[in-house]
From Swiss-Prot:
Organism: Rattus norvegicus (Rat)
The entry's keywords: Cell membrane, Disulfide bond, Hydrolase, Membrane, Protease, Secreted, Serine protease, Signal-anchor, Transmembrane, Transmembrane helix, Zymogen
Complex and partners: Monomer.
Family the UniProt entry places it in: Belongs to the peptidase S1 family.
Listed EC numbers: 3.4.21.-
Regions crossing the membrane: 18-38
Full protein name: Transmembrane protease serine 11D
PROSITE patterns: SEA, TRYPSIN_DOM, TRYPSIN_HIS, TRYPSIN_SER
CDD domains: Tryp_SPc
């Protein structure tokens, strides 16, 4: 009997090309859906900054509230920041609120007014005016907390990102995380990035890096006296700003060099100088001043500090062109002066810092540069000036720095700061 040849039904098998095409389209659609979801959940949000002021009703203004270096200024600012933070964490804005920061405490009558910047993160689609109204509503409910009575301002002002940067760079000691009121604090690696240490200065002799320095105002740089032992003519010197010594962001001539009159090149005592710039620098995100400590500020042994500069990476090596950073710890003078260390050569006006293994240290070319520490409000203070040491990075031979607190009055006498 004739049996026709069986035919393969096209409905039972797919062309491999069609299968691959369907898989690709399906994966693409899933990826697009996931991308849109991520975008709307995360990238759809943006930061909003606001400024307000608060009258502290039960605190009298004193001179101690004139500087962020004092215990009184720091304590009151932290109490105000904590009070505002708690208010938003307990409100319906808890998911939008990021951070607040007291920019300045100022006198009004006999009382104190706190200028405050606040950061929120919300969807770009939200009504900006409605957010502002909700913020104002929370602030109006502030009254007292921890024996602190606050009368909030009747209004708040919206700030652009640039406005916020302009406000916060007028404050001393602000690194990028504070300028953006970020929750992140990252200091890693050995090479600094643009803006990481905005007060770092390269003091250049005939346009070649010779010493480091620290910007302490728009006109003055703090450095070491030994930098000028052989070259004290201001006309030979320039100050540059930025992470690179060969392509700086800014170059300014030096007007005057004021080294400590009692600097001793043998004992290295009083190794401190200030340099007056030929013109004031304009503070920006990447160039602004560090905070000076109070004369009474206590520098605790084993506390973390950072040293920065363009010095050589090994003893006897060449200086580098890109700014380097190193994490060290404060070493007590007693330990530093032990026989295995410096055997009594570390004087009261000096400060030791390093690591036990000796792996991180200042070296040639770092002289005059800053040793800085961060306080509890993320403000940075210069506590030391790179001065001397035995070679570089040896165990039991930490770097020796001029102790800035010991010369706080001298700095004020020379600069008015």
């Amino acid at each position: 009997m004739y049996r026709p040849r069986s035919m393969v039904s096209p409905s039972r098998f797919f062309n491999p090309f069609m299968v691959a095409l369907i898989v690709i389209i399906t994966v693409g659609l899933l990826a697009m859906t996931a991308g849109l979801l991520i975008h709307f959940l995360a990238f759809d949000k943006r930061a909003y900054f606001y400024h307000s002021n608060f009258h502290i009703l039960n605190v009298d203004y004193t001179e101690a509230l004139n500087s962020p270096a004092t215990h009184e200024y720091r304590t009151l600012s932290e109490r105000i920041e904590s009070m505002i933070t708690d208010a938003f964490r307990e409100s319906n804005l808890r998911s939008e609120f990021i951070r607040t920061h007291v920019v300045k405490l100022r006198k009004e009558g006999s009382g104190v007014v706190a200028d405050v910047v606040m950061k929120f993160r919300s969807s770009k689609r939200n009504n900006k005016k409605a957010i502002k109204t909700r913020i104002q509503s929370v602030l109006q409910r502030l009254s007292s907390s921890g024996n602190l009575e606050i009368a909030p301002s009747n209004g708040i002002t919206s700030l652009t990102d640039q406005d916020t940067e302009n406000v916060l760079t007028q404050e001393c000691g602000a690194r990028p995380d504070l300028i953006t009121l970020s929750e992140e604090r990252i200091i890693g690696g050995t090479q600094a990035e643009t803006g990481d240490w905005p007060w770092q200065v390269s003091l250049q002799l005939n346009n070649v890096h010779h010493c480091g320095g620290t910007l302490i105002s728009n006109l003055w740089v703090l450095t070491a006296a030994h930098c000028f032992r052989s070259y004290s003519n201001p006309q030979q010197w320039t100050a540059t700003f930025g992470v690179s010594t060969i392509s700086p962001r800014l170059r300014v001539r030096v007007r005057a060099i004021l080294a400590h009159a009692e600097y001793n090149s043998i004992t290295r005592d009083n190794d401190i100088a200030v340099v007056q710039l030929d013109r004031p620098v304009t503070f920006t995100r990447n160039i602004h001043r560090v905070c000076l400590p109070a004369a009474t500020q206590n520098i605790m042994p084993d506390s973390v500090a950072y040293v920065t500069g363009w010095g050589s990476l090994t003893y006897g090596g060449n200086t580098v062109t890109n700014l380097q950073q190193g994490e060290v710890r404060i070493v007590s003078s007693e330990v530093c002066n032990e026989p295995a260390g410096y055997g009594g050569s570390v004087l009261p006006g000096m400060l030791c810092a390093g690591v036990r293994s000796g792996a991180v240290d200042a070296c040639q070319g770092d002289s005059g540069g800053p040793l800085v520490q961060e306080d509890t409000r993320r403000l940075w203070f210069v506590v030391g000036i790179v001065s001397w040491g035995y070679q570089c990075g040896l165990p039991n031979k930490p770097g020796v720095y001029t102790r800035v607190t010991a010369y706080r009055n001298w700095i004020r006498q020379q600069t008015g700061i």
